[in-house]
């Protein structure tokens, strides 16, 4: 039997009260899926840039699972799609994304979902990303696939671009990305790219991530990918 664990990366920077509210909703959601859930922080404190890769690596180190579902703290997805993604990840190496349509819920509907007054599937999304355009919000990988890339690249911090880089890493080292047909829903919070709430360092971190992504776009071998995920340049 395939052992599965959900790893949720999270640390509250104290900036947006909707983020911990979303986390509570997401944990309640996963409680119904009958798989262990591991909440993993990045080892940093205060309002330091959140390092999702560090949180993922810490979680992967602590859990003993054949397949790990790396799922963000603001995402909801049907259990049936998770079960299908786990089976796909266990059957062959490579990244599996357990949805093909990313639905951004409105602030109002997100509040209703958190309050259990409406199901996410009954909401009209603020916008959507179709045909697998969205990468990174939920990643399902086998231990073999994770070992193939070495680890999540901890040079990335803050918001944006790390997800695209890691998709490249998985594809170079483990084969094509696969998707499960179906939706996932994003609970609204202050955005990580754009807005008056972002600090100069928030913007600088995203700019550094964008520059680092180019190294992944130039990488063509598993050896080079593992150099990068280990922190190389």
Named regions from a protein language model:
Residues 38-62:
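Active-site-proximal specificity loops/subdomain of glycosyltransferases
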Residues 78-154:
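Conserved catalytic core of nucleotide-sugar-dependent glycosyltransferases
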Residues 10-31:
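Short, well-formed alpha-helical segments that are part of the catalytic scaffolds
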Residues 52-57, 75, 134-138, 159-167:
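Conserved glycosyltransferase catalytic-site signature
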Residues 15, 155-233:
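C-terminal catalytic/acceptor-binding lobe
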Residues 65-76:
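Short beta-strand-to-loop acidic/aromatic patch adjacent to the donor-nucleotide binding site
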Residues 3-8, 30, 36-39:
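Hydrophobic targeting segments
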Residues 63-66, 151:
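Active-site acidic short loop of glycosyltransferases
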């Amino acid at each position: 039997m395939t052992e599965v664990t959900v790893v949720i990366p999270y640390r509250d920077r104290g900036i947006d009260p909707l983020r911990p509210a979303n986390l509570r909703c997401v944990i309640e959601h996963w409680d119904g899926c009958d798989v262990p859930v591991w909440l993993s922080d990045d080892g940093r404190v205060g309002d330091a840039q959140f390092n999702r890769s560090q949180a993922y690596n810490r979680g992967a180190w602590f859990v003993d699972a054949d397949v790990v579902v790396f799922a963000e703290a603001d995402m909801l997805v049907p259990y049936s799609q998770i079960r299908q993604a786990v089976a796909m990840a266990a059957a062959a190496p490579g990244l599996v994304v357990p949805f093909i349509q990313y639905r951004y819920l409105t602030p109002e509907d997100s509040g209703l979902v958190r309050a259990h007054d409406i199901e996410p599937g009954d909401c009209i999304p603020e916008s959507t990303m179709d045909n697998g355009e969205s990468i990174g919000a939920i990643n399902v990988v086998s231990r073999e696939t994770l070992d193939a890339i070495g680890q999540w690249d901890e040079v990335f911090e803050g918001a944006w671009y790390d997800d695209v880089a890691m998709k490249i890493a998985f594809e170079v080292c483990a084969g094509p990305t696969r998707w499960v047909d179906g939706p996932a829903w994003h609970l609204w919070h202050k955005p990580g790219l754009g807005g008056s709430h972002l600090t100069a360092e928030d913007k600088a971190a995203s700019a550094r991530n964008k520059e680092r992504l180019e190294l992944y776009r130039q990488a063509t071998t598993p050896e080079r990918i593992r150099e990068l995920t280990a922190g190389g340049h």
